[in-house]
Every structure is written in C-alpha cells, then in structure tokens.
C-alpha cells in the first residue's frame, strides 16, 4: 500500500493538511472508520448472554468495558461541542479513578442497550463536529485539542477498548489495518504527554515503528521528553515492525510485546533491538 496518500497530509499540529498546504477537515473517512468500529463492537455485545465475562489482562468485565465506551463516546460528543467535562487529570491513575467513579454511576450493563447507545453516541460525535467552526478547540481529559484530533482520539479509543472486548468474546478485531493512519493525529498528540517519567529517566533513544505497510512513524526520547513524528529525526536505535493491528494493540497494552514477538507478529531490529521490549512500559497509555 502507498503510505504517502494515507499519511503525508496529516499535520503534526493536529490538523489534516493537503500537500498544497490547505488545511481541510477530512472527517468523512474518520467518521466511516469510527462508526464501523462502533458497529462491530456493538455487534459483539448486543446478544451476548454473559456481560460479566472477564477481559484478559484487565480489571474490567465485558459489561464494564462496553459501558465505558458508551458513556465515554457520548462524552466525546459533548467535547466536540466545546463543552468542558471534568474527568480525571490526564494521567493513567487519574483517568482510572474517574473511570471507576463513572462506572459506579452509570450502571447499565445490558448488552443490547449499550450497543444502541454506543452506535448513537459515535454518530453524535460527528454531528456535533460538523456543526462547529473549523477552528474549534475541544477540552478533553488529555488536554485541549482540535476537533480533528478529537475524532482521531475516538477512533483510537474505540479500537483499543473494542479489541479488549474482542479478546474476551473471541471476536475478530473491530478495526482494520487501514484505520491506523486515521489514529496518527491522536498518537502524535498524546504520546509526548504520557511518558512514564521514571522509565524514561536517563534514556536517549529513537524508535522507528512500522505498522505493516499502512503507517511508519517514530518516537524520540531525549532528556526526559518524548517527541513523535512520521519519520525518525536521526538513525533509529530500534526498529519495531509488525502486523499493523497487532503492533497497535501492543503499544496500547491490550497484547504484550513478548507474546507478539513469540508469535512472529512483531520483530525488533536495529543497533539496539532489545530496547523494543521496553517501549510499552515507557508510556502510561490511559
């Protein structure tokens, strides 16, 4: 696949950009992806007889994860409108506490009801986004971001939690490999904001990530700070390559790096390949 047509117009400033430099809102492709993913997740839970199934490597059940997706997606619709919704402090710990409080208050666990609410909320995000001025900035738990980045956040969030549900119910991943470029705006926005300070202390390294043939990007760790770009700023110390879907799920900790490597789905190379084993632990992905 030619990654130029998929990625080169994604600006690191949180805006979609054409090669001619004109900023445009490429929301149609993002909307199709988000609504498709939401529909697939809804299909996993709509007729599920036991919503109390535990999710592997998670404290949540399927019902709790589906409830989280339903109310969080509705929250994103309100954020797209420009409303500020206090919800944690952007840290993994703060968001975990906010999620726990929200799940106590939002008690719906019926799969059919949650499926309908999730699909409706995903549509609502884009209804709100279309009604906003092009320079709309949206307050979110991860900071204030352009509405285009919020839409990318939605695709990422649905893919991450939807895939966790898929591991519990034995369903296919709800997102496609071609959805990865649509997540780039949020990935570039959030990764510099969520490093584990203790883990990156004293580390200077450049990681090149190759998500199949759909997205190449890089994460640079220098002096306690992280930057993200579509190309490495210097020769990479470690190249992490693999199946686009599985590598994404490793980064967001739905799957483990060790398991993906053992299965042959991810490979590490470069001058310091073992650095790749540390990559997921360098970030507190919320």
Positions of predicted regions on the chain:
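Glycine/small-residue-rich hydrophobic helix-like segments
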Residues: 208-250
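Structural signal for well-ordered, non-membrane alpha-helices
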Residues: 38, 42-46, 73-77, 119-130, ...
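Alpha-helical scaffold segments that form or flank carboxylate-/histidine-based iron centers
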Residues: 15-32, 52-72, 102-114, 139-157
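C-terminal interaction segments
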Residues: 232-286
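Helix-loop segments that flank and shape redox-cofactor active sites
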Residues: 40-61, 82-87, 128-146
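Short, helix-capping/interhelical loops that line the mouth of catalytic, cofactor-
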Residues: 2-29, 74-135
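Acidic, aliphatic-rich amphipathic alpha-helical segments
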Residues: 134, 138, 147-217, 222-223, ...
């Amino acid at each position: 696949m030619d990654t130029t047509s998929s990625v080169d117009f994604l600006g690191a400033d949180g805006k979609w950009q054409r090669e001619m430099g004109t900023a445009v809102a490429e929301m149609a492709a993002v909307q199709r992806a988000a609504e498709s993913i939401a529909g697939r997740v809804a299909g996993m839970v709509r007729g599920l007889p036991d919503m109390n199934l535990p999710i592997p490597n998670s404290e949540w059940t399927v019902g709790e994860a589906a409830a989280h997706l339903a109310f969080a997606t509705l929250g994103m619709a309100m954020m797209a409108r420009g409303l500020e919704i206090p919800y944690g402090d952007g840290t993994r710990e703060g968001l975990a506490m906010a999620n726990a409080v929200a799940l106590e208050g939002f008690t719906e666990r019926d799969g059919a009801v949650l499926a309908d609410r999730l699909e409706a909320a995903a549509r609502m995000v884009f209804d709100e986004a279309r009604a906003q001025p092009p320079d709309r900035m949206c307050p979110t738990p991860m900071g204030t971001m352009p509405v285009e980045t919020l839409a990318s956040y939605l695709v990422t969030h649905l893919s991450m939690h939807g895939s966790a549900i898929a591991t519990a119910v034995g369903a296919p991943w709800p997102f496609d490999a071609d959805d990865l470029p649509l997540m780039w705006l949020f990935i570039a926005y959030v990764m510099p904001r969520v490093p584990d300070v203790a883990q990156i202390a004293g580390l200077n390294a450049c990681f090149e990530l190759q998500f199949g043939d759909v997205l190449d990007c890089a994460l640079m760790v220098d002096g306690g700070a992280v930057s993200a770009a579509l190309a490495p700023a210097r020769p990479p110390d470690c190249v992490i390559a693999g199946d686009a879907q599985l590598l994404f799920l490793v980064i967001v900790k739905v799957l483990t790096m060790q398991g993906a490597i053992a299965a042959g789905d991810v490979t590490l190379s470069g001058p310091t390949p073992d650095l790749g084993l540390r990559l997921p632990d360098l970030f507190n992905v919320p």
